[in-house]
């Protein structure tokens, strides 16, 4: 059994006649309160947790991205020779981070058919507001500069590819 001791100086209500309605004598005679409760141990059995040395640590694979500059987002959409899949994300969004390797796979699989662009909604709130981005991640597929499909939430690579192909009526 474990116990916790609280002195009357730790718990202000034990010193205060107004808060407890206890007389001054009773309040002075209460010097400590003990709470007892069972403490359970967590058994790990034969589980072993190896320590990681600097040689065994995993480092994330670097993905090369083409950083392009355009006068405006609309220029990018209108001047693209392929449909553009725009991923609206935020760095603090867990599902958005989950989608990073999936988008890389989709981009590689459909590289001849679409261009993938990521827009950080924290850095570009005007673009997010224009397209009424209220959930993250949100994907909008643009064809000829106009939105042709929109979907929200995390998807598998297979689901995302199928959705894009259905929207564009293209097959790999």
Curated annotation (Swiss-Prot):
Disulfide bonds: 93-96
Cited PROSITE patterns: THIOREDOXIN_1, THIOREDOXIN_2
Superkingdom of this protein's organism: Eukaryota
UniProt entry keywords in alphabetical sequence: Chloroplast, Disulfide bond, Electron transport, Plastid, Redox-active center, Transit peptide, Transport
A GO CC term assigned to this protein in UniProt: chloroplast
Annotated site (Contributes to redox potential value): 94-95
Annotated localization: Plastid, Chloroplast stroma
Xref: InterPro entries: Thioredoxin, Thioredoxin-like_sf, Thioredoxin_CS, Thioredoxin_domain
Tissue-by-tissue expression: Expressed in roots and seeds.
GO molecular function, one term: enzyme activator activity
Keyword presence, Repressor: no
Example of a GO biological process term: positive regulation of catalytic activity
Residues of the transit peptide: 1-62
Active-site residues, record numbering mapped to chain: 93, 96
Site (described: Deprotonates C-terminal active site Cys): 87
Family the UniProt entry places it in: Belongs to the thioredoxin family. Plant Y-type subfamily.
PANTHER family hit by this protein: GEO12009P1 (PTHR45663), THIOREDOXIN Y1, CHLOROPLASTIC (PTHR45663:SF15)
Name assigned to this protein: Thioredoxin Y1, chloroplastic
